[in-house]
Amino acid sequence: MAKRDYYEVLGVAKNASDDEIKKAYRKLAMKYHPDRNPDSKDAEEHFKEAKEAYEMLSDGQKRAAYDQYGHAGVDPNVGAAGAQGFGGFADAFGDIFGDIFGQAAGGGRARGGPQVYRGADLRYSMEITLEQAAHGYDTQIRVPSWAACGVCHGSGAKPGTKPETCPTCHGQGTVRMSQGFFSIQQTCPKCHGTGTYIPEPCVHCHGSGKVKETKTLEVKIPAGIDDGMRIRSAGNGEPGINGGPSGDLYVEIHIKPHAVFERDGDDLHCQMPIPFTTAALGGEIEVPTLAGRASFTVPEGTQSGKTFRLRGKGIKGLRSSIAGDLYVHVQVETPVKLTDQQRDLLKQFEKSLAEGGPRHSPQSKSWFDRVKSFFE
């Protein structure tokens, strides 16, 4: 009897995604599994047919060959897998049901061996100044870490004893459990995937084989780093379990508020008070920058709130080839605590302005004109 088209068997289109193929197979496998149909030869055949179709279409290379050449394009011996019974059912379902039955994130195992886990990542928060962020900064930090226990030398067992092979999983680290109509492989509940257990734990480390310590690490903060960025130190997180890789350490940077500048990306902003005489007459003023002092000319008649841009006086960011700019926002300062002489001089000055008409205060004239038209 000629084989049916694999896509037809699973009930999916030829352009079906891997996820759609997986879902279709899962549905058919549950429907026709022999545990649900113990006396049905028809169900058994449907199950074998679905299993074979899934094995072909879930493999990228086999699927490509099948799409191009049909059944002749795939290994003719693959069909014999159906005669092997149902021993491979759990393996075929491993990628489908693995997340349902508690596969730990970051975990894995060599086939038949104990569970291996990657160590957890650590996070360290560091505050630096704006100057340190702009110019770069080398420092040292002290972070919690783990070291082999000096009493049991990392074995976790009381001196004079040693770990023994787990009697539940026989050193495999996993046990096979039956759930309903199929079986799954789980981490051994007694040894938690290690393949061994400790009859007499070390009293110093409580059987963990490691003790907490503090280690010092060198941290190089690159010039131009911004608030909230993280620096990764590979392998300096928590140690792995059963030979798994260590996690990473992430140093999160926070920049302290600055007394003069506010940062906006690669640009800097500062508020600069100037005397009203300088604003009226113009003149050169000096401003601070992260690289020292700089000066620029304020034109006569400068109004409060005017912004001046100093190119290249900002910060060169991590991904920038040139530095940002410094924006100076001038605030015209009104004098206070005047002497009698100063008051008299200002009154004379005010009188001379009034005699000159609105040409001395164009913004005031414009504002009063708008107010006048508003009430008309």
UniProtKB/Swiss-Prot annotation:
<dbReference type="GO" id="GO:0005524">
    <property type="term" value="F:ATP binding"/>
</dbReference>
<keyword id="KW-0863">Zinc-finger</keyword>
<dbReference type="GO" id="GO:0051085">
    <property type="term" value="P:chaperone cofactor-dependent protein refolding"/>
</dbReference>
<dbReference type="InterPro" id="IPR012724">
    <property type="entry name" value="DnaJ"/>
</dbReference>
<keyword id="KW-0479">Metal-binding</keyword>
<dbReference type="InterPro" id="IPR036869">
    <property type="entry name" value="J_dom_sf"/>
</dbReference>
<dbReference type="GO" id="GO:0009408">
    <property type="term" value="P:response to heat"/>
</dbReference>
<feature type="binding site">
    <location>
        <position position="205"/>
    </location>
    <ligand>
        <name>Zn(2+) 1</name>
    </ligand>
</feature>
<keyword id="KW-0346">Stress response</keyword>
<feature type="binding site">
    <location>
        <position position="166"/>
    </location>
    <ligand>
        <name>Zn(2+) 2</name>
    </ligand>
</feature>
<feature type="binding site">
    <location>
        <position position="188"/>
    </location>
    <ligand>
        <name>Zn(2+) 2</name>
    </ligand>
</feature>
<dbReference type="GO" id="GO:0031072">
    <property type="term" value="F:heat shock protein binding"/>
</dbReference>
<protein>
    <recommendedName>
        <fullName>Chaperone protein DnaJ</fullName>
    </recommendedName>
</protein>
<comment type="function">
    <text>Participates actively in the response to hyperosmotic and heat shock by preventing the aggregation of stress-denatured proteins and by disaggregating proteins, also in an autonomous, DnaK-independent fashion. Unfolded proteins bind initially to DnaJ; upon interaction with the DnaJ-bound protein, DnaK hydrolyzes its bound ATP, resulting in the formation of a stable complex. GrpE releases ADP from DnaK; ATP binding to DnaK triggers the release of the substrate protein, thus completing the reaction cycle.</text>
</comment>
<keyword id="KW-0143">Chaperone</keyword>
<dbReference type="GO" id="GO:0051082">
    <property type="term" value="F:unfolded protein binding"/>
</dbReference>
<feature type="repeat" description="CXXCXGXG motif">
    <location>
        <begin position="202"/>
        <end position="209"/>
    </location>
</feature>
<comment type="subunit">
    <text>Homodimer.</text>
</comment>
<dbReference type="GO" id="GO:0042026">
    <property type="term" value="P:protein refolding"/>
</dbReference>
<dbReference type="InterPro" id="IPR018253">
    <property type="entry name" value="DnaJ_domain_CS"/>
</dbReference>
<feature type="binding site">
    <location>
        <position position="202"/>
    </location>
    <ligand>
        <name>Zn(2+) 1</name>
    </ligand>
</feature>
<dbReference type="InterPro" id="IPR002939">
    <property type="entry name" value="DnaJ_C"/>
</dbReference>
<feature type="domain" description="J">
    <location>
        <begin position="5"/>
        <end position="70"/>
    </location>
</feature>
<keyword id="KW-0677">Repeat</keyword>
<feature type="repeat" description="CXXCXGXG motif">
    <location>
        <begin position="149"/>
        <end position="156"/>
    </location>
</feature>
<feature type="binding site">
    <location>
        <position position="149"/>
    </location>
    <ligand>
        <name>Zn(2+) 1</name>
    </ligand>
</feature>
<feature type="repeat" description="CXXCXGXG motif">
    <location>
        <begin position="166"/>
        <end position="173"/>
    </location>
</feature>
<dbReference type="GO" id="GO:0005737">
    <property type="term" value="C:cytoplasm"/>
</dbReference>
<dbReference type="Pfam" id="PF00226">
    <property type="entry name" value="DnaJ"/>
</dbReference>
<dbReference type="GO" id="GO:0008270">
    <property type="term" value="F:zinc ion binding"/>
</dbReference>
<dbReference type="Pfam" id="PF01556">
    <property type="entry name" value="DnaJ_C"/>
</dbReference>
<keyword id="KW-0963">Cytoplasm</keyword>
<dbReference type="InterPro" id="IPR008971">
    <property type="entry name" value="HSP40/DnaJ_pept-bd"/>
</dbReference>
<feature type="binding site">
    <location>
        <position position="152"/>
    </location>
    <ligand>
        <name>Zn(2+) 1</name>
    </ligand>
</feature>
<keyword id="KW-0235">DNA replication</keyword>
<dbReference type="InterPro" id="IPR001623">
    <property type="entry name" value="DnaJ_domain"/>
</dbReference>
<dbReference type="InterPro" id="IPR001305">
    <property type="entry name" value="HSP_DnaJ_Cys-rich_dom"/>
</dbReference>
<dbReference type="GO" id="GO:0006260">
    <property type="term" value="P:DNA replication"/>
</dbReference>
<keyword id="KW-0862">Zinc</keyword>
<dbReference type="InterPro" id="IPR036410">
    <property type="entry name" value="HSP_DnaJ_Cys-rich_dom_sf"/>
</dbReference>
<feature type="binding site">
    <location>
        <position position="191"/>
    </location>
    <ligand>
        <name>Zn(2+) 2</name>
    </ligand>
</feature>
<feature type="repeat" description="CXXCXGXG motif">
    <location>
        <begin position="188"/>
        <end position="195"/>
    </location>
</feature>
